[in-house]
Amino acid sequence: MAQTLYGLIGAKLGHSYSKIIHEKIADYTYTLLPLPTEAEARAFFAKREFAAVNVTIPYKQLALPCCDEVDPRAKAIGAVNTVVNRGGRLYGYNTDYAGFAYLAKAHGVDFAGKTVLVLGTGGTHATVSAVCRDGGAKEILTASRTGRDGALTYEQAAARSDVQIVVNTTPCGMYPETGQCLLDVAALPQLETVLDVVYNPFATELVLRAKDRGLTAAGGFEMLVAQAVYAAEHFTGKPLDSETLIPQISRELQKDLQNVVLIGMPGCGKSTVGAALAKKLGKTFVDADEEIERRTGKAIPDIFAQEGEAAFRRYEADVIADLTRQNRQVIACGGGVVKTPENRHALRQNGPVLWVQRPLDKLATAGRPLSKGGAALREMAHERLPLYRAAATATLCNDGALADTVAAALHLLK
C-alpha cells in the first residue's frame, strides 16, 4: 500500500462511523482496516505503508511502542489513538483526551470536587481518568468484572453511595449487543451524571436508564466526532475550526443516521404517515407488524388467536430489538409495543420517538385483535397513555391531511 493511505485500524470495525466523519472533515479517502490479531496490527505498523491512521479497540496500548515519537500526553496516558507517518517515522498522539473533555464540556459536566466511577480498565479508562484528574476530581474509582489490580467489582461499585459521576469506557451496550448494562444507576443516590464513550447506539441502555431518572446523560458520538476533528489536524498538519466543525458534523450525522420511530394507538395512521415521512427523509420505511408477519409466516390476528398475546409480544420484542439496532429507518410500530419495558428503551436508542395522536373516534379498528372500538378502545387508551408518554420524545397530531402531518413531523425533526 502507498503512503497515501488514511484510515482506522482495530479488531472489529463493523460498528464504525469514522469513515463518514473523516470524509466530512477533510478531502482524503478514509479506509476501515480491520486487523483481527495483535500480530497483524504489529505487522501493519512495522511496514509503515500508510500516511496516517486512527487506532481503536484493542490496539491503543499496543500502538504506543510501535511509534518512534509519542506526544507527552499520550505517553502519560499510555495509549495512542492517532499515528502519523512523517517521512517513515511514526508519531503517536492521543486525541481521545480532548474528545472526552469536549463531550464533558458540551454537557456542562464539571469534575471538580466530584467522586467519579470509571467502568472498565482498558486504554480509554486511562484517558478518561486523566481528564477527570486534570479537572480536579476528588476521587476516581475504577470498576471491572474481575475487580483485579485495585479495581472494584461492579457489585462493590454499586454500593458506593458517594459516586456522583459514572463514565463507561467498556464496550458494554455497543452494537450489536445493545440493551446490556453493567450498573444499576438507581443504586447510586448521589449520582448526577452518566457519560458513555460508546457511540453506537447513540444512547446505550446505561444512558437511557440515567435519562429516565432525570440525570445528565450522554453517549459518545460527540466525543467520536471531536477526536476525529483533532486527529484530522494531525493528519493534515493544518488547524481546523473545531468549535464550529464538531457540533455541525455531530448534528448533521446524527440527523442522517438516526431512526425515526412512530408509536401510538392502533389505527392512528403510523404506517401511512411513516411511509410518506420516510420518502421525504430518504430513509428506509419499516412496518414492525409486517416484519413480524414475514418472520412468523402468520397474520397477526392468527398469532393472537392461535398462540395468544404473550407469544405475539415475544415475537414483537425480537423484531424491535433487531430493527432499532440499525440506522436510517422510519419504523412504524404496533400499538402495543410500549407494553414491553425492554421495547421502550430499544425504541429510543438510535433516534427520536414520535407519538402519533388521533381522536379515538377516527381510529381504524378493522383487523386489529385488541382494538374493537367503544368502551374497550377507551380503556386501552387509558392504559397505554402513560406508556406512550414515557416512550415518546415528541407528539405528532394526525387529525388532518397527510401532507400536513408529514410537514409537522419534519418540523419536529429539525
Task: Name each region found by the language model.
Residues 246-255, 276, 280, 386-414:
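NTP-dependent small-molecule kinase module
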Residues 150-218, 337-343:
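Rossmann-like adenosine-cofactor binding region
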Residues 2-107, 201-203, 209, 213-216, ...:
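Phosphate/diphosphate ligand-binding glycine-rich loop within oxidoreductases
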Residues 197-258, 398:
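Adenosine-phosphate binding glycine-rich loop
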Residues 10, 92-97, 104, 109, ...:
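Glycine-rich adenosine-cofactor-binding loop
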Residues 290-348:
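ATP-dependent small-molecule kinase phosphotransfer cores
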Residues 349-387, 391-394:
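A glycine- and Lys/Arg-enriched "phosphate-lid" helix/loop adjacent to the NTP-binding pocket
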Residues 134-152, 289-296:
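NAD(P)-binding Rossmann-fold cofactor-contacting core
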